[in-house]
Amino acid sequence: MAQRYDRAVTIYSPDGHLLQVEYAQEAVRRGSTVMGLRTNNAIVIGVEKRSVGDLQEERMVRKICMLDDHVVMTFSGLTADARILVSRAQMEAQSHRLNFEKPTTVEYITRYIAQLKQNYTQSNGRRPFGLSCLVGGFDEDGTPHLFQTDPSGIFYEWRANTTGRSSQPVRDYMEKHADEILTIADEAAAIKHIVRTLVSVSSLNHTQMEVAVLKYRQPLRMIDHQVLADLERTVRREIEDEAEASRRPRAP
């Protein structure tokens, strides 16, 4: 039945679905896990790092991109599609600076990306972008924002969110610890929370993750692998201690 309605992106299935858009969302679900967290003064991004061949240049395999000096984006899904979106968004940000002599807001550039994605769900001869993006940054007054866009073109603002292959268990974990996330005030606690989530839920080690921090009017900072290694040891020890404590018989 599906094959009758997935030949073109503009054809609805009988139950009201655009199957090409759903296929694009499946590409996202098969992509690397990425997550973002917004504090009062920082945007912290954590991504699953794919293994790189011994002869491959590691700098060419990046999932964290700057759209402007104050906006960072990461994604899950098709890297080639992301390259096009990043290039278009960067040009839009530069054009906005030239025309209005001030940087874009984070919502403006997110809305531009979402509109571009949505346009590709209504045109023949095209296919939807097969990626979901997390866009974080600061407005001119220093207000931090974190948005997510989907292949369909919708976007929402979040305090913390994730996308990719482990997005559901990671989101469940974050919702379980929502009170803790809402009280995170500094970047150190945010970095530790992201490392703990990737270690405990996605079963990653420090060599399989990248973490970046963006602060107001400061350049993007990649967290050193030695720092990630130390944090991994700390959170693994905490997880073991919590598991041991839960196994102890409770006092009557």
UniProtKB/Swiss-Prot annotation:
GO CC terms of this entry: cytoplasm; nucleus; proteasome core complex, alpha-subunit complex
InterPro entries referenced in this protein's UniProt entry, alphabetically: Ntn_hydrolases_N, Proteasome_alpha, Proteasome_alpha-type, Proteasome_asu_N, Proteasome_sua/b
Tissue distribution: Testis specific.
Gene3D superfamilies: Glutamine Phosphoribosylpyrophosphate, subunit 1, domain 1
Record's keyword terms, sorted: Cytoplasm, Nucleus, Proteasome
Cleaved signal peptide residues: none
Keyword hit for Cytoplasm: yes
Assigned protein family: Belongs to the peptidase T1A family.
The protein's name in its UniProt record: Proteasome subunit alpha type-7-1B
